[in-house]
Amino acid sequence: MLSLEECTDAQIERLIKPTFYENHRAIRRRQEDLFNKLCSVLADYAFVEDMVKKINTSNSDCDCDCDDCYRNVFANLRCGAWYANYRLSKTCVFKSIDGHNQNHQFSKQRLNIDVVLRASLRGGYCAIVDATKSRTKRFPDALGKTVPIWAAVINRAVAFDVLALRRRDSNSNSNSDMWYRYCDGEIELHEDELPEFVSENELSAIRVKMKQFVKDFKSVCADDCFKELVEALARSGPLLCKYVSRNNAFDDVKHLKERRM
């Protein structure tokens, strides 16, 4: 380190008056210390608690620390476990790597059948909790791409069997109409099945792989499990994805509550 006598005027000025960039870096370092990171986790945990409460009841005094409120909440491992009640929430595994651009995959090891069965209960839904460290993405690829691809694959895999079952059921309703869009011969992927931030090029790349994804799912899903899925989704209708963040929490939570009624 130079002494003041050895410093030039420019170096002394920088010591006394740091540049904007140096100030910005110093602030960033302070914001990313352990205390601030834990405060951020706590704030997001409180946000999840509030959303769970709003979805489950209109009573603002509801105690979220109960089995009923968390019966449909899944923490996506591992990151999501920081933000959901670890004692009450269930867990699922959707990997971001399966949704990375130019590397879209359907995992034969991570079918997450329990998520489907829970979402298909009467008035049911599933809230999958996850987070991303990206400063440019609102949702991690696990939520924004892997989950909707997974839902689209399962809808197409069971569509024909669901329609056949509903035709035999005298109590079938207009819910059947929703299934016809998943029975196209080319297993077309519709634009509204993925979030708006997925580009058209990426959507086209996923479409090309959908037929193989459906085959992959059917090749590993046991017959008894497949039958259970068909019966469950025949009652509830196809899987639909909604994305809730701080920016759109009110509108989408209101929509979820309306669907459950």
Regions found by a protein language model. Give the residues of each.
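Non-catalytic regulatory/accessory regions that flank a structured catalytic core
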Residues: M1-M261
